[in-house]
């Protein structure tokens, strides 16, 4: 028996699951994967969501086929009656659920549920406010190049439960994990944990910064002396305050990957973090350097879209935080015309005043959050504002000079005008490739 929360004991062993009734909250890909895995383990399942419209046809067909109990509607105590365990999908805030069920009910993440069903796979888990997808992708590429079989999943696309259900097994599982996924992890213990950085983010979901940091550090809280934690310099105090037991290594750019095609010092640091993890599992330095040299920058992450009339257009739509904006600005020596704006998530924009003054010639704002940027930088740099990204791109393209960079680095979420950062980045690329052709 293992204690996972609230001083209560739940066994996660396979043969114990028929004893439990589990509420799976949320019907996206993570919720569906958790439900399918629980069904295979013999648990009784109740699917909970606010509305039937959220459920895909595939999932609804599966629910009917398996006769799982379903409850739709606003969250209420009745949804959690007779429930032993709640598995919330990432993005479902716990503070919206907990008022509706007793403290004796255990909260478990889909990731932890699946992790406990693994066999002998080594696990590399990566989190951080910025950089985690690049590090996870680099880890996977290095391992594959070394001839080591890999599953890559978590926040990067495929829930771990889907891997557990498939018959093909691998040597190493690489997981990118968000604070949403980690917050409900109590036992999770990867062999290697990487935390790229922690800066203000998701305070619309977490109650405060302390809760956000605590969620992130769940990635290494349960590690012991035989495990490895790879952390960014500046996180030394957290090792003591959270009483981390793992071997701790702090990574930085050591110049090992100077031939990388990735823009920015932060990406060279990401390569170092990936290399430290993979070296632990037998990847040679030669292989690591080969991978980093040929590694293509990921979409929406300092993605060079087009060189038009001597102006380089760069898409960093994934950069939704103040620290991501800092890293993007530090990646260029050329003068920058900065595109920023959206739904502001918090952070100290005034901390960027020195680099804005040094590196940026004009700031082109679009969408919401105009006042945050104007208050922070309005006295040191020209700022324009347009309602849409397309209008802002057109304006800056008329103002740009040969040899300059027009950089989309919003420092905000996209939810004021777009479904997500991907839709925003794709719209930017459409504008650069299609609209500017007509505009020129």
UniProtKB/Swiss-Prot annotation:
Protein keywords: ATP-binding, Cell cycle, Cell division, Cell shape, Cell wall biogenesis/degradation, Cytoplasm, Ligase, Nucleotide-binding, Peptidoglycan synthesis
Pfam families xrefs: FAD_binding_3, Mur_ligase_C, Mur_ligase_M, MurD-like_N
Enzyme nomenclature, EC number: 6.3.2.9
GO CC term, one of those recorded: cytoplasm
Binding site for ATP: 128-134
Function: Cell wall formation. Catalyzes the addition of glutamate to the nucleotide precursor UDP-N-acetylmuramoyl-L-alanine (UMA).
Main location: cytoplasm
Signal peptide: none
Reaction(s) catalysed by this chain's protein: UDP-N-acetyl-alpha-D-muramoyl-L-alanine + D-glutamate + ATP = UDP-N-acetyl-alpha-D-muramoyl-L-alanyl-D-glutamate + ADP + phosphate + H(+)
Subcellular location: Cytoplasm
Pathway per the UniProt entry: Cell wall biogenesis; peptidoglycan biosynthesis
SUPFAM superfamilies with a match to the protein in the record: MurCD N-terminal domain (SSF51984), MurD-like peptide ligases, catalytic domain (SSF53623), MurD-like peptide ligases, peptide-binding domain (SSF53244)
Family, similarity comment: Belongs to the MurCDEF family.
Phosphoprotein among keywords: no
GO BP field: cell division; cell wall organization; peptidoglycan biosynthetic process; regulation of cell shape
InterPro entries: FAD-bd, Mur-like_cat_sf, Mur_ligase_C, Mur_ligase_C_dom_sf, Mur_ligase_cen, MurD
Annotated protein name in UniProt: UDP-N-acetylmuramoylalanine--D-glutamate ligase
GO molecular function, one term: ATP binding
